[in-house]
């Protein structure tokens, strides 16, 4: 993305370096187009930034990055810890090309116990509040649902929506199969239900032994009072809990909330496997693959530290933080310590630093982190402890159960990385096959950009177009776009295709033309960086889900915009719409191609086409459902957002509102009898 402060004047580093202070802070490098190249943190800004421009033995990639620097910005902080926090925020926000970057996943699922008189268990994603109880985060939706099933089996807490709970007149099926105590119909008192909720919360917090002891005491008390049915119910609850504890690996101890981090590097890629233990229960794991890792690690290996500045510079490089390049002396020490393994270890430690900073700063962090490699940062752990409000311990060589967990995490990281490398090899082969099939010449196949369009509607209703993007040998979901199609005859797919292609590429063509005009006015010969970036947004291949008719519409649009029609390829479905029978139709008059089921090129085309279809149809269905679910209530006179929300909550949805009588409608807060009659008339 181009910054509004694109640089047009020559860059003179000496003047800038002379003005830098000997203070901690964060520095940012920008290119001529205003795009950020790198974000780093330094104990001494002057020493750190100067090291990039005073060394002569730089690796080719680093030398290339330095030549692209056109502007330097610095921010002074009060401490190195503040610099670390600011660096982490900027890396997430700017996604620099030469920093290790993990996808910022803020949607970890939680298990929620609501603040209702009879609390409900629920799967939850989003920001947490203080009103309800939240347990987690969990590594996956499956882990949350498994925990809910366990709590249903042992403590029989309800999972129904409040609107359903408030309107039940008899127990549901879950009560009949022993998964709910039916508080909706008064089958259990509020006090007894509160005890079950408390036991469930303690179970999730890892205090299983307390729960078992109290249940045992309760069972004996019922037996002493000759209440044998109640005693048998508690005995069954204890049996279910004992079965759960036996089936799962449970760690007994005060610090039963643990995260296990295993890092594996292989084949130029790195995997971080995060396993979560909550309440002593292993909840599963999740694999992360950082972006920009190749450039960032090459930067780290290239020797951009501060050894020229003496001992202080060496100390700073030894404590290099996530995304910050290590110095040549540190690299030399690594190589001397172990010719075979030290380099890999430094790479993995660098990635682990980046992951810990980006994953935990500003989020919940457990008291114990078990790691496969020792992070290089000395300030990171202190900052995590300060933000969490409790001490965060790092365990490098665990024992017992934790050692088994770390071993399992390392094995899963290796398996995930091997699977990724295998898939990448297959995808690269498919990309190469497609380029050869279409006679497309490309020096770097990773830069081959393919966009695919599809139209979806239901009998002309809720028409939507999708655009999916493929480059670097994989689908780029962050670049997908949906387009609401309006102003056409319902069901006219040709008009819809014309509209989406025009909206997609008209602005890109204008941006490229403006960049070229600006360069011409500035007297720049050849293609500048600004013009190259504008042109790079245009795809190399455009796939159209359709036959000759759709391709002809696309050809007309591209001709009007002055674009090359040879990049247009239609994907016509074969007999029975079976994969492998498609025909590729070209806009420039080439003979249509039938590649056959075994063609690697056709496999890639089908993959991209199917993804465009999926993305279009899910968007269309959501749009259609929203229109059908809410339109009738939104059209009611005298019903605003609050009253509409109360009606839906009271009757459980639009169908319940339609089925309600005038008296039932009038019983809702804010609905008078006259307004209830008006609502009833408008709905019937």
From Swiss-Prot:
Positions of the UVR domain: 209-244
Q: What domain of life does the native source organism fall in?
A: Bacteria
Per its UniProt record, what InterPro entries does this chain match?
Answer: GIY-YIG_endonuc, GIY-YIG_endonuc_sf, GIY-YIG_UvrC_Cho, Hlx-hairpin-Hlx_DNA-bd_motif, RuvA_2-like, UVR_dom, UVR_dom_sf, UvrABC_protein_C
Q: Name one GO molecular function term.
A: excinuclease ABC activity
Among PANTHER family, the record links this protein to: UVRABC SYSTEM PROTEIN C (PTHR30562:SF1), UVRC/OXIDOREDUCTASE (PTHR30562)
Say which family it is in: Belongs to the UvrC family.
The protein depicted here goes by the name UvrABC system protein C
Quick one: which gene encodes this?
Answer: uvrC
């Amino acid at each position: 993305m181009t910054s509004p402060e694109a640089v047009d004047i020559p860059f003179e580093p000496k003047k800038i370096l002379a003005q830098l202070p000997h203070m901690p802070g964060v520095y940012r490098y920008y290119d001529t187009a205003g795009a950020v190249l790198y974000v780093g943190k330094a104990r001494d800004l002057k020493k750190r930034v100067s090291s990039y421009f005073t060394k002569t033995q730089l690796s080719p990639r680093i030398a290339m990055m330095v030549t692209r620097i056109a502007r330097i910005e610095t921010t002074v902080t009060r401490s190195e810890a503040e610099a670390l926090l600011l660096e982490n925020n900027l890396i997430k926000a700017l996604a620099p090309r030469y920093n290790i970057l993990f996808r910022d996943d803020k949607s970890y699922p939680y298990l929620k116990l609501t603040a209702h008189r009879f609390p409900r268990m629920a799967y939850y994603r989003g920001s947490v509040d203080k009103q309800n109880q939240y347990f987690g985060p969990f590594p996956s939706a499956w882990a949350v649902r498994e925990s809910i099933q366990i709590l249903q089996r042992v403590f029989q807490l309800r999972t129904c929506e409040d609107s359903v709970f408030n309107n039940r007149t008899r127990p549901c099926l879950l009560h009949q199969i022993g998964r709910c105590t039916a508080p909706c119909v008064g089958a259990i008192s509020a006090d007894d239900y509160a005890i079950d909720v408390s036991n469930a919360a303690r179970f999730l917090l890892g205090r299983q032994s307390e729960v078992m002891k109290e249940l045992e005491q309760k069972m004996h008390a019922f037996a002493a009072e000759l209440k044998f049915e109640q005693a048998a119910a508690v005995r069954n609850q204890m049996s279910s809990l004992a079965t759960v504890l036996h089936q799962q690996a449970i760690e007994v101890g005060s610090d039963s909330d643990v995260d296990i981090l295993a890092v594996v590097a292989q084949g130029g890629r790195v995997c971080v496997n995060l396993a979560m233990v909550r309440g002593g229960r292993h909840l599963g794991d999740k694999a992360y693959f950082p972006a920009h890792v190749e450039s960032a690690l090459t930067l780290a290996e290239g020797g951009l530290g501060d050894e020229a500045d003496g001992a202080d510079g060496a100390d700073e490089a030894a404590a290099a933080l996530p995304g910050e390049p290590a110095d040549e002396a540190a690299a030399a020490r690594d190589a001397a310590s172990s010719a075979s393994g030290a380099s890999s270890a430094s790479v993995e430690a660098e990635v682990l630093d980046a992951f810990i900073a980006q994953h935990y700063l500003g989020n919940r962090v457990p008291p114990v982190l078990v790691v496969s490699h020792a992070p290089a940062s000395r300030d990171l752990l202190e900052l995590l402890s300060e933000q969490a409000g409790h001490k965060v311990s790092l365990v490098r060589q665990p024992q017992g159960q934790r050692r088994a967990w770390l071993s399992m995490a390392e094995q899963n990281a290796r398996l995930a990385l091997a699977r990724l490398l295998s898939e990448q090899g297959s995808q690269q082969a498919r990309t190469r096959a497609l380029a050869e099939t279409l006679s497309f010449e490309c020096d770097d196949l990773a830069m081959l950009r393919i966009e695919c369009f599809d139209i979806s509607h239901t009998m002309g209703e809720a028409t939507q177009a999708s655009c999916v993007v493929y480059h670097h040998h994989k689908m780029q979901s962050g670049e997908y776009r949906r387009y609401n199609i309006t102003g056409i005859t319902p069901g006219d797919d040709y008009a819809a295709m014309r509209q989406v292609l025009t909206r997609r590429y008209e602005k890109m063509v204008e941006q490229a033309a403006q960049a070229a005009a600006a360069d011409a006015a500035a007297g720049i010969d050849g293609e500048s960086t600004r013009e190259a970036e504008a042109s790079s947004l245009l795809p190399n291949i455009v796939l159209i889900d359709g036959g000759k008719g759709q391709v002809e519409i696309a050809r007309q649009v591209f001709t009007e915009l002055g674009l090359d029609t040879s990049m247009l390829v239609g994907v016509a479905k074969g007999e029975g719409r079976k994969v492998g029978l498609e025909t590729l139709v070209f806009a420039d008059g080439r003979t249509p191609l039938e590649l056959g089921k075994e063609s690697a090129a056709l496999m890639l085309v089908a993959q991209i086409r199917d993804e465009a279809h999926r993305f279009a149809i899910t968007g269309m269905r959501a749009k259609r459902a929203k229109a059908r679910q809410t339109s009738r209530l939104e059209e009611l006179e005298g019903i605003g957002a609050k009253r509409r929300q109360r009606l839906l909550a009271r009757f459980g949805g639009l169908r319940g509102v339609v089925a309600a009588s005038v008296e039932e409608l009038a019983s809702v807060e804010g609905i008078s009898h006259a307004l209830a009659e008006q609502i009833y008339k408008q709905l019937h």
